[in-house]
Amino acid sequence: MIPATKNTKDTKKMDATADNVPSLCDAIRQTAYDLHVYLGVGYLEKVYENALCHRLEKRGMSVRRQVPIRVSDMDGYPIGEYIADVIVENMILELKATSTLTDAHVAQTLNYLKATGLKHAMLINFGSETFQCRKLAL
């Protein structure tokens, strides 16, 4: 499992626990939506990642970018590695800048959850004219 990081801000820590997952999702979703309205479509995924992380950090959230996730065989032998776009308060954020979300994007995000042991993720697409955001859980 990926170790948690400390929140260095003097604000209340929002961790992705059963009690506050809805409020954490709402805060992330609203921040991402506001960013989508501000920037619109057409930028590379990295631009949206940088801007979203900046805005979430300003809200006092613990944000980690480009987090390596090891995939192991049943016996623990490492067989591959993913890179998660962003982890906020133990919730994976998988960001896209494509015309629409696909089943493959959902499967990728669910695999990140399986590989990390984390329970919650959000799949956010900035590339569509209509804002797309899906909450996923195991």
PLM regions and their residue ranges:
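Conserved catalytic cores of phosphodiester-cleaving nucleases, focusing on short active-site segments
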Residues: 40, 63, 84-99, 112
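Short, low-complexity, charge-dense intrinsically disordered segments
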Residues: 1-19
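A short, glycine/Asx- and small/polar-enriched loop/turn
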Residues: 78-82
